[in-house]
């Protein structure tokens, strides 16, 4: 089976073109693929298919609201094999892949996800890199909570961007303190507020100046710390705006993997950032057949 390796601000993925759902992406298969010692290594897997094929293949039980059977469907799996509703960095890489291999000839089209339709605009692209804007949909705030990250307690906003987030703005946190924080360690959070788990973002307060700029690190549900999280940057941008008494505006978010720009409006939110497709290859049938025996 062919694959492409790509990343969006160093949030990396194995892209599998499997339009007709010929492979079973079992938990074991995804875990093995994403393992950085015995597999290709990635934060997640992006299967390329369509809504119609996903319905026929049993990947989707029902059609997500607002999409058509002909729309591309991003079947996204976390590194632990769990199914995720949405991944903003993944959508950029997914859209770039479609354009680069000729499966899509438009610069503006819809990528469907379990969280619903995500319209994308490819601002520029080459076989290697792309600049992509994703309409991430409305940001929904549904409360406040706390998390313990790296032994430190943080307060934040509970935010839905198609998946759950706790975005914690710390007014006294310096960029150096953020840099050395142990974000990779298991986090503690309110399981009643987040019964299905949560992505936790820790960020500095917005800097003064014409551009609201923050620094962020993230512990992703089902993965651990990643170099970037697209939906997490949107949640962080919204929390940063709320911190300065706003609900709309633009925020530049710096993550360990690079920088993205988030715009929050009254109706939606937009994530603009890079994508890179760095390698193509083929996974042998023998490897697929031996997944269960991999040590």
Swiss-Prot record:
It comes from the Bacteria. Gene3D superfamilies: Diaminopimelate Epimerase, Chain A, domain 1. GO terms for molecular function: diaminopimelate epimerase activity. HAMAP family: DAP_epimerase (MF_00197). Homodimer. Belongs to the diaminopimelate epimerase family. This is Diaminopimelate epimerase. It comes from Mycobacteroides abscessus (strain ATCC 19977 / DSM 44196 / CCUG 20993 / CIP 104536 / JCM 13569 / NCTC 13031 / TMC 1543 / L948) (Mycobacterium abscessus). The lineage of its organism: Bacteria, Bacillati, Actinomycetota, Actinomycetes, Mycobacteriales.
